[in-house]
Design a protein with these regions (language model features):
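C-terminal partner/receptor-binding element of secreted or periplasmic proteins
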Residues: 123-165
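N-terminal signal peptide c-region/cleavage motif recognized by signal peptidases
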Residues: 13-16
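Sec-dependent signal peptide recognition
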Residues: 1-7
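Broad, structure-driven detector of short, well-ordered beta-strand segments within folded domains
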Residues: 41-45, 56, 115, 125-130
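Mature extracytoplasmic domains of secretory-pathway proteins
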Residues: 55-121
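Active-site-adjacent core segments of small-molecule enzymes
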Residues: 40, 110-117, 122-124, 136-142
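N-terminal secretory signal peptides
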Residues: 20-80
Length: 165
């Protein structure tokens, strides 16, 4: 019976959405606190693990204070997102509309932030959406960013519709 949780944990841990950690670009204090950590905005970068040549930057609020310093504060759902083509686009595998590109816990137990991807077939544009959800209910707060797939060097750019499942 103890084997089932271990197997589930192994499956979750090997997911491409969890395989990489974002790179911290910088943090900026927004609320000064004298004896505890300040509230901050933190900007991170992450490469799409399934599509080479695409990177996303996102900014999240990080709570300070005693609860934030101990990692117990529930973070708010405000997240901004910007994704860009940073090199030649190369698809590593087929994907489905709405596949999770990145997932991160935003509270001790229940809240998580997710970046999902899709393909606008008509315009050959990758579409990224970031949102937060909870065990019971999610937040309507979200941000969307698009990446038109452009030629990089010589040759035609790939068509994202050819890589949809």
């Amino acid at each position: 019976m103890r084997l089932i949780p271990a197997i589930l944990l192994a499956l979750v841990a090997t997911s491409p959405a969890l395989a990489q950690s974002p790179d911290l670009i910088f943090k900026k204090s927004t609320v000064f606190r004298l004896l505890t950590p300040d509230d901050k905005l933190a900007t991170y970068a992450i490469d799409d693990p399934e599509i080479e040549g695409v990177a996303c930057h996102y900014t999240v609020p990080e709570r300070g204070g005693v609860a934030g310093g101990l990692g117990l504060a529930e973070e708010v759902s405000d997240v901004s997102l910007a994704c860009r083509q940073v090199g030649p686009v190369k698809f590593k595998a087929k994907f489905e509309q709405g596949d999770v590109m990145f997932r991160q816990s935003r509270s001790l137990l229940f809240k998580r932030m997710q970046i999902v991807r899709g393909c606008d077939e008509k315009r050959n544009v990758l579409v990224y959406l970031v949102y937060s959800d909870k065990l019971i209910e999610g937040s309507p707060k979200n941000s969307t960013s698009t990446v038109p797939i452009m030629p990089w060097g010589s040759g035609e750019p790939p068509r994202c519709k050819d890589w949809l499942k």
